[in-house]
């Protein structure tokens, strides 16, 4: 009885979600960030560094404040996605305030990661995400599929289906996410449904920002 009920609920959940977005080809850093006219040395490296053909990769980006580390990290992420090594991003930060600020920045980049016409989901993942109006205003209602709002006749781009936002354990399943580092760490700790978090991180570029500030939060 439970299995049949779970199957029907899973089908209903999948019917709500838009199809998986297709990643676009990487062109150059200005295609992601038009305001960059002269890339910094770190940003140039992010567009040129060789990617391994197989296996996981670790990149450590360290530079002065204002050197464009965020743009460099997202450029590398875009290159990894375009080469077929990933299909999404999770951007981890130490605090809810820094995650909120990064969410606003990712809204502008999201459409440039995927092909035109795609509807990738962007989630803000932390325990107080519902208090950020910039996020809650972009949550698609479960009944919106096929409606004028979902179909972009009313602009709600760079949002996510409410199914993702109902629970933090499902948040990492969105195509692109930004949140506090604990949302990812709970995937490897003894929390309920930790395997669901790991599934959400699979095939994603995992960016850890502000590393120097994590001691107080881990």
Stretch-by-stretch model annotation:
Residues 1-218:
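N-terminal helicase ATP-binding lobe
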